[in-house]
Amino acid sequence: MPGPCCNDVCECAAGGCKTGCVCTSCRCSPCDKCTSGCKCPSKEECAKTCSKPCECCP
């Protein structure tokens, strides 16, 4: 049986899947705007390049 986080929606934590979860399609919600500490020009780039997009983007 698949893990509890791999059903319909993966739980997001620290920019990716929750610890212990194995999900190939897990994605954090898009960020509206990157914070000053996050050197990314857009929400798309932030999600791709920032180490922890869920935390560095509000």
UniProtKB/Swiss-Prot annotation:
Keywords: Cadmium, Metal-binding, Metal-thiolate cluster
Binding site for a divalent metal cation 6: C40, C46, C50, C57
Transmembrane segments: none
Beta: region residues: 1-29
Residues that coordinate or bind a divalent metal cation 3: C12, C17, C26, C28
Region: Alpha, residue numbers: 30-58
GO molecular function: metal ion binding
Residues the entry annotates as binding a divalent metal cation 4: C31, C34, C50, C54
InterPro entries: Metalthion_crustacean, Metalthion_dom_sf
Entry binding sites for a divalent metal cation 1: C5, C6, C17, C21
Protein name, per record: Metallothionein
Source organism of the structure: Astacus astacus
Organism taxonomic ancestry: Eukaryota, Metazoa, Ecdysozoa, Arthropoda, Crustacea
